[in-house]
């Protein structure tokens, strides 16, 4: 089955305009589906909301930092000095332990910050996007796709090369 998928992706097509766009949509749908089916079971999974995912990471980080700070606190003084020379970031991490213990409060602030940034992004004018350097990346990506579209139209291209833009 994998060999069939690879040969399908290496097939050369010569399309222009709407036909190229339709092929791009079909390729992206099939390549995304095949990647998912190779990496996961075929059973569809419902995506978990961000509110469920982020706290688990915060809790894991909190547990790790708490464990490290307790471990370091119980070390003899000579080893603490050696450890701080080898791991200068550890004292910096320890300053965040009290903050991370209130991770639910921190997460609420984090969600507010995300909402504010999203509303600011919606209100941003193109000149502000240019100032932030956000327009350059998308322009380069469009130029690359335009060059590929010209190649697909005049010479032909593989489905794999189109799948890179999914």
Curated annotation (Swiss-Prot):
Q: In which tissues is it expressed?
A: Expressed in the corpus luteum of pregnancy and in the placenta.
Output the Gene Ontology terms for molecular function.
Answer: hormone activity
- Per the record, the major location class is secreted
Q: Which residues form the signal peptide?
A: 1-5
| Keywords on record | Cleavage on pair of basic residues, Disulfide bond, Hormone, Secreted, Signal
Residue ranges annotated as propeptide are 37-138
List the InterPro entries hit by this protein, alphabetically: Insulin-like, Insulin-like_sf, Insulin_CS, Insulin_family, Relaxin, Repro_Hormone_Insulin-like
Q: Which GO terms describe its cellular component?
A: extracellular region
- CDD domains reported for this sequence: IlGF_relaxin_like
The record's disulfide annotation reads: 16-153, 28-166, 152-157
Q: Does the keyword Thylakoid apply?
A: no
**Pfam families the record matches:** Insulin (PF00049)
Localization recorded for this chain is: Secreted
Q: Which family does it belong to?
A: Belongs to the insulin family.
Q: What does this protein do?
A: Relaxin is an ovarian hormone that acts with estrogen to produce dilatation of the birth canal in many mammals. May be involved in remodeling of connective tissues during pregnancy, promoting growth of pubic ligaments and ripening of the cervix.
Per UniProt, subunit arrangement is: Heterodimer of a B chain and an A chain linked by two disulfide bonds.
Q: What is this protein called?
A: Prorelaxin H2
The protein's organism comes out as Pan troglodytes (Chimpanzee)
Species classification: Eukaryota, Metazoa, Chordata, Craniata, Vertebrata
């Amino acid at each position: 089955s994998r060999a069939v998928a690879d040969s399908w992706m290496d097939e050369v097509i010569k399309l222009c305009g709407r036909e190229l766009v339709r092929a791009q949509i079909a390729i992206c749908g099939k390549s995304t589906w095949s990647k998912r089916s190779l990496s996961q079971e075929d059973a569809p999974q419902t995506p978990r909301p961000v509110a469920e995912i982020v706290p688990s990471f915060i809790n894991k980080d909190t547990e790790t930092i708490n464990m490290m700070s307790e471990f370091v606190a119980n070390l003899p003084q000579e080893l603490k000095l050696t450890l701080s020379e080898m791991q200068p970031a550890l004292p910096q991490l320890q300053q965040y332990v009290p903050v991370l213990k209130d991770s639910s409060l921190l997460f609420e602030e984090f969600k507010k910050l995300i909402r504010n940034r999203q509303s600011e992004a919606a209100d941003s004018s193109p000149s502000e996007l240019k100032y932030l350097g956000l327009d350059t990346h998308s322009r380069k990506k469009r130029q690359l796709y335009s060059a590929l579209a010209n190649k697909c139209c005049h010479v032909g291209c593989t489905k794999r090369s189109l799948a890179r833009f999914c």
